[in-house]
Amino acid sequence: MTDQTSDVHMVRGHRPPKAEFMVYFTIIFIAALPLAFIASFLAMVRQGDLKTKGPIARAWSQARIITPMIFSA
């Protein structure tokens, strides 16, 4: 009996083109900025300190979460 698992070729996952990924990331980041400013302002008002995540960090996080979802669909 032959061992059919010894010569298995691993198929590499399809990686999205870098330029296209960055275009989508930029669009999502810009779209998330206004909502991130509002969320940061409300968090600052409620908590009363500036230790909360800033608006740019919030928008960046959202873009990092959403953009790969688009390419994996």
Swiss-Prot record:
Biological process according to GO:
bacteriochlorophyll biosynthetic process; photosynthesis
* Record bears the keyword Nucleus: no
Q: Which Pfam families match?
A: PufQ
Q: Which cysteines are joined by disulfide bonds?
A: none
Q: What domain of life does the native source organism fall in?
A: Bacteria
Keywords of the record, alphabetical order, are:
Bacteriochlorophyll biosynthesis, Chlorophyll biosynthesis, Photosynthesis
Q: Which InterPro entries does this one have?
A: PufQ_cyt-su
Family as reported in the entry's similarity comment:
Belongs to the PufQ family.
The free-text function statement in the UniProt record for this protein reads: Required for bacteriochlorophyll biosynthesis. Directly involved in the assembly of both the B875 and B800-850 pigment-protein complexes.
What is the name of the protein in this document? Protein PufQ
Native source species: Rhodovulum sulfidophilum
